[in-house]
Amino acid sequence: VCRYITELIERGEIEKNSRFRGVQTAKIARLKAEAKCPVVGEIACGVPLLAEENIESYITLSREYLGSGKFFILRAKGNSMINAGISDGDLVVVKQQETAEEGQIVVALIDNEATLKRYYLDNRHKRIRLHPENDKMEDMFYETISIQGVAVKVIKDLQ
């Protein structure tokens, strides 16, 4: 029995449980891994709004759901990202990082104000284009911005 258990552990199908003498499937262990994400205020989905640095609360999410990295949560304010499925009041889960690929939705810090927009490089004019996902709004152009993170999930209240 010991040889079979060792073989299953080596293949990554089960994991030893350190709390007691037992094992659990690797999938259950991944589902149990959690990340405590701070809710740090509102983010403008329209005109940039000062992002609050104070932590309002924490939401615990599964690592299986998030993946690896450091995360924080902002509450969407406004309607500039409605075509991306982000509405006023939604919680946006953001992976904290300083770079982004074109087309990703980023939290951009501009003159100490944060906004949530789709990120593009305008190489011809050597500037950054932040695109609101709302046909009634126009793109915003900047020489420099500070990327605070990339939006990875949206938590909606359906009621």
Language model region names:
Residues 9-17:
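A short, conserved structural fragment
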Residues 19-36:
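Short, cationic-aromatic polyanion-contact patches
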Residues 29, 43-49, 136, 153, ...:
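Active-site/binding-pocket entry motifs
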Residues 30-31, 45-46, 56-57, 80-82, ...:
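Short, catalytically relevant binding-site loops at active-site mouths
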Residues 34-72:
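Amphipathic alpha-helical dimerization/coiled-coil segments
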Residues 65-159:
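Acidic/glycine-rich C-terminal interaction modules and beta/coil loop segments
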